[in-house]
């Protein structure tokens, strides 16, 4: 029996959100393991960062090669590593500005709900957004590194706000990709990875903004 277009969209959305929820749960577990001292806290942050970057490429390669079992395992490992990577940041704000953590989490969830509702309840077409959002993201990353290395007089709050707008746009765009089924043969795992990165980055940006207010 042939599925209708709506059934296909819902199936892909449910699978994508399932992978996203699992990934976020594993990340929360990674944060807990670090804060609880189960994992050594003296491991350099850049080691987790390099491992995470390598895993992103590995997930994309294995998913595109249709090795879904390995890709799923790598996504789980990546999610835990990402939790260990962001754990020191979360731990700091839990001590210095605990309200900021809750506000950042609620804000991120709210943005995701709004993005999903707008994309799925309207006929909005975001096909042209991709290149501009990617360009804006690269610009934000370059400015961030330049500010860090050359100590440029750039407002960190303004930079955070700019990157926040970019990731809000990426969240809308990635939900549109799910609806339009554009991710290398409708791969729910890769779509979930994109939305996961949107979620984590938005959470960290909002955490920085709310933390400054406190």
What does each of the following model-derived ranges do?
Residues 1-214:
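A hydrophobic alpha-helical transmembrane-helix feature that marks the membrane cores
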């Amino acid at each position: 029996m042939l599925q209708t277009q709506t059934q296909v969209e819902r199936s892909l959305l449910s699978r994508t959100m399932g992978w996203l929820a699992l990934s976020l749960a594993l990340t929360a577990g990674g944060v807990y393991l670090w804060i609880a001292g189960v994992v050594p806290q003296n491991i350099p942050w850049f080691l987790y960062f390099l491992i995470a970057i390598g895993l992103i490429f590995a997930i994309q390669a294995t998913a595109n090669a249709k090795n879904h079992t390995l890709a799923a395992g790598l996504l789980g490992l990546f999610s835990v590593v990402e939790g260990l990577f962001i754990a020191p940041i979360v731990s700091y704000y839990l001590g210095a500005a605990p309200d900021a953590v809750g506000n950042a989490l609620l804000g991120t969830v709210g943005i995701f709900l709004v993005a999903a509702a707008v994309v799925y309840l309207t006929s909005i077409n975001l096909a042209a957004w991709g290149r501009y959002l990617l360009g804006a993201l690269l610009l934000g990353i370059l400015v961030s590194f330049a500010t860090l290395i050359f100590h440029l007089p750039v407002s960190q709050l303004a930079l955070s706000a700019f990157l926040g707008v970019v990731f809000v746009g990426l969240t809308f765009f990635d939900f549109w990709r799910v609806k339009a089924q554009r991710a290398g043969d409708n791969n729910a795992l890769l779509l979930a990875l994109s939305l996961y990165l949107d979620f984590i980055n938005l959470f960290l940006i909002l955490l920085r903004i709310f933390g400054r207010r406190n």
